[in-house]
Amino acid sequence: MLPETFKLEIATPERLLVSADIKEAQIPGEGGYLGILPGHAPLLSALQPGVISFPREGHTERLVVTWGYVEVLPTKVTVLAEAAEKVEEVDVGRAEQALQRAMDRLKQATVDVDVARAQAAVRRATARLHVVGKL
């Protein structure tokens, strides 16, 4: 018999953001978003910048995460992220500025521009703006 819930833990090096029993979650993995339900087959994936969402106490909770790893087990999902923010912690002005700086760097496309780093900055800023409804 499959469990009805699983434990979700989301942590950064600085803090534990979430530790809750939930019924489902969407997590940005290396190959796209992972839909996780109780009893999911075990897997380990790189975490991509994006939004983790899960229903909790009558509403959908959403967090922005950057790089890291996600471990999925049938009764527990652990997300270890370089950085993560709850919706109310996102600084919209800062995210908009970061997106503009990264886009400007990509437009330059000279030898001096670290394209991969600029693309990563675009993904992080886009995820932050998406979670607060600005994209």
Which sequence ranges carry the predicted segments?
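Short, charged, intrinsically disordered terminal tails
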Residues: 1-5
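Compact, glycine-rich, soluble single-domain proteins
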Residues: 7-101
